[in-house]
Regions:
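Active-site rim/loop-helix segments in enzyme catalytic domains that contact anionic ligands
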Residues: 1-106, 133-134, 138-142, 226, ...
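Metal-dependent de-N-acetylase/amidase catalytic core
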Residues: 1-8, 89-242
Length: 242
């Protein structure tokens, strides 16, 4: 049986966990929940420096991810062994089964991943979100619907567009479609420390350069989600089933 408070995060690259759900992971881990992560790649191509790309960068980013997860309290990290920027080209059923295998081990009560827009429309994000959704339903059927019980997609509410001034780089969700908002104000600094672990990434450096401005706006105190299962418009006060 699943733990009543266990959370599995399923993402594509090192740093997705810190940007997307770092506060939620830290908050729940500190409260005693078991938080696990499945990461499809090691981010081997996340650089403009050809001398760094490949296994060397993958090793660097794996270390960054493990340090970030230690800060957040993520108890277990599983790398799925896919190549950065090629996940969308991989055999889909193989990806689904790789994620399903982690779900069977972790036995989570709730799963968080990317929605259809991948937040940034990155093909790896979209592929991982689709596969995680398929794996969620596959494992539920195989396990007699005992677990996992809830599926959430990371979402950026439309109201934050004016704060982040990201143009078309990020995909936003109408505020009324948000079904869960986790208050991370108590662990916001923990989230920022985790993001800072990803030193090799320009996105992390840029985010931290604007962090004080965004903190002052009050728009960084919540992480938001759309509940993909069970469907419905009910608002959740927690990601865990009652």
């Amino acid at each position: 049986m699943p733990s009543p408070r266990s959370l599995l995060l399923v993402f594509a690259h090192p740093d997705d966990e810190s940007f997307g759900v770092g506060g939620t992971a830290a908050l729940y881990a500190a409260a005693g929940a078991r938080v696990s992560l499945a990461c499809a790649t090691k981010g081997e191509r996340g650089t403009t420096d050809p001398a760094l790309a490949g296994q060397k960068l993958g090793a660097i980013r794996e270390g960054e991810l493990r340090r970030a997860c230690a800060i957040l309290g993520v108890a277990d990290v599983s790398f799925l062994g896919y190549m950065d920027a090629d996940v969308d080209k991989a055999d889909f059923d193989g990806l689904v089964e790789a994620i399903a295998a982690v779900m069977r081990r972790a036995r989570p009560s709730a799963v968080v991943t990317f929605g259809p827009d991948g937040v940034t429309r990155h093909p790896d994000h979209v592929a991982v979100g689709r596969a995680a959704t398929a794996a969620f339903h596959r494992v539920r059927r195989q396990e007699g619907y005992r677990y996992p019980r809830r599926l959430y997609y990371v979402a950026l509410p439309e109201s934050r567009r004016k704060v982040f001034r990201s143009g078309d780089a990020l995909m936003y969700t109408p505020d009324e479609q948000i079904t869960a908002a986790v208050d991370i104000s108590r662990v916001l600094d923990v989230k920022l420390k985790a993001i800072a672990c990803h030193k090799s990434q320009e996105d992390a450096r840029s985010f931290l350069a604007h962090a004080d401005e965004w903190k002052a706006s009050g728009e960084m105190t919540q992480e938001c989600f759309v509940r993909a299962w069970p469907r419905g418009k009910r608002k959740d006060s927690t990601l865990f089933p009652g």
